[in-house]
């Protein structure tokens, strides 16, 4: 008798509306975004969107309902497409809607296009209850974030453009296209911190740029690392600027949407991965380069197979510099299974009060 009531109640709780909902045995969840939410290098069951799905089915529904999952996210996706890349794709007769293997880190289809494709393909967009999203760092650029020679002012301007203005436009469009969805915007984490060892930073940079083995000792040794450390403080500061400014931008986006809607349409979930769990630290929750320069994640062999032919064709057709090595090692700096689980727990903690308010303090809606 309670079957279906869980879905009905959860949909009402997530939408924030008091209107009646059709009796349903499932809710629908849409996942859009970049490599963070895609779960670069992770098996499906390790990804935080999947862990959220399982939590809803097992702990919230108590087995009395299911979550229907649609994933459009992929590695490298930007919010919008750079005009120069758009022109190069057109010259090469390549579509910006083309879908490569999602582990291959290219900017297209953009998150905007993911959103519009999901909307056009859905029979009833009003039935989507949860829309989980991440985006912005591929637009800003990790290399630009940690580059100690670039201007902090320009970094802040890039973060404002992509994480506040472009993300704001995207979230507003998502709210319009999926009018009953709760949008979960997932934040990022610090990249390099005072706990990140210089040896690890230099080693992984050399691997990403395919520095030959004979050249590594002259570049990465105690004497040269002293020179690198002159830049380390600037890299750490820029990483902190990225974290603080992107979090502030995402918070503003969510608060603006909620204020304009007159109800809670979106929540922002800051990353639980802090400075001590950042890149290369003793207790890191992020992937580094593996032994002998190979990927350290369980999906690395897939990228070693998929990246070379896909990017060779793109380079030939567009004359753009898509890096095969960056693609093969794309898991570097992304959450490990433990990091993904921590993000899933943060999402669950953020959703708990939304459900509890609807169900008198009980997260589990299918109660007697």
Residue ranges of each PLM-predicted region?
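Short, amphipathic alpha-helical "lid/cap" segments that border enzyme active or binding sites
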Residues: 160, 164, 168, 337-348
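Charged, often glycine-rich, active-site loop that binds/positions anionic groups
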Residues: 75-111, 280-296
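Solvent-exposed loop/turn segments at secondary-structure junctions
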Residues: 35-38, 74-79, 136-142, 189-193, ...
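Mobile gating loops/cap/lid regions near enzyme active sites that modulate substrate access
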Residues: 197-240, 244, 252-256, 263-334
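N-terminal export signals
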Residues: 2-20
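Oxyanion-hole/transition-state-stabilizing segment in secreted/luminal serine hydrolases
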Residues: 32, 89-159, 184, 188-204, ...
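Serine-esterase "nucleophile elbow" of acetyl-processing enzymes
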Residues: 21-86
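Structural recognition of the beta-strand scaffold that forms the well-ordered cores
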Residues: 28-31, 37, 68-73, 129-134, ...
């Amino acid at each position: 008798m309670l079957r279906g009531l869980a879905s009905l109640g959860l949909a009402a709780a997530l939408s924030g509306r008091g209107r009646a909902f059709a009796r349903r045995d499932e809710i629908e969840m849409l996942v859009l975004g970049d490599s963070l939410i895609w779960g670069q290098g992770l098996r499906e069951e390790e990804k935080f969107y999947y862990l959220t799905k399982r939590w809803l089915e097992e702990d919230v529904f108590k087995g009395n309902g299911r979550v229907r999952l649609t994933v459009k996210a992929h590695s490298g996706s930007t919010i919008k497409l750079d005009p120069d890349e758009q022109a190069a794709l057109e010259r090469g007769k390549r579509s910006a809607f083309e879908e490569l293997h999602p582990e291959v880190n290219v900017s297209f289809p953009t998150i905007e296009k993911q959103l519009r494709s999901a909307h056009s393909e859905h029979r009833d967009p009003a039935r989507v209850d949860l829309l989980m999203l991440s985006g912005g760092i591929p637009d800003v650029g990790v290399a630009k974030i940690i580059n100690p020679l670039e201007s902090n002012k320009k970094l802040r301007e890039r973060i404002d453009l992509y994480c506040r203005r472009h993300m704001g436009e995207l979230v507003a469009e998502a709210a319009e296209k999926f009018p009953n969805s709760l949008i979960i915007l997932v934040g990022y984490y610090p990249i390099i911190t005072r706990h990140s060892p210089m040896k690890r930073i230099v080693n992984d940079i050399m691997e990403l740029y395919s520095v030959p083995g004979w050249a590594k000792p002259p570049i990465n040794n105690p004497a040269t690392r002293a020179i690198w450390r002159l830049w380390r403080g600037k890299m750490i500061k820029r990483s902190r600027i990225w974290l603080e400014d992107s979090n502030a931008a995402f918070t503003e986006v969510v608060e603006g949407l909620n204020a304009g809607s007159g109800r809670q349409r979106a929540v922002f979930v800051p990353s639980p991965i802090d400075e001590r769990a950042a890149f290369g630290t003793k207790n890191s929750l992020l992937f580094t380069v593996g032994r002998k320069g190979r990927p350290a994640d369980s999906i690395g062999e897939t990228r070693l197979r998929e990246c070379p032919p896909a990017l060779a064709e793109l380079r030939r057709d567009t004359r753009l510099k898509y890096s095969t090595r960056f693609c093969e090692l794309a898991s570097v700096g992304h959450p490990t299974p433990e990091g993904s689980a921590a993000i899933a727990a943060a999402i669950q903690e953020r959703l708990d009060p939304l459900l509890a308010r609807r169900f008198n303090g009980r997260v589990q809606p299918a109660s007697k």
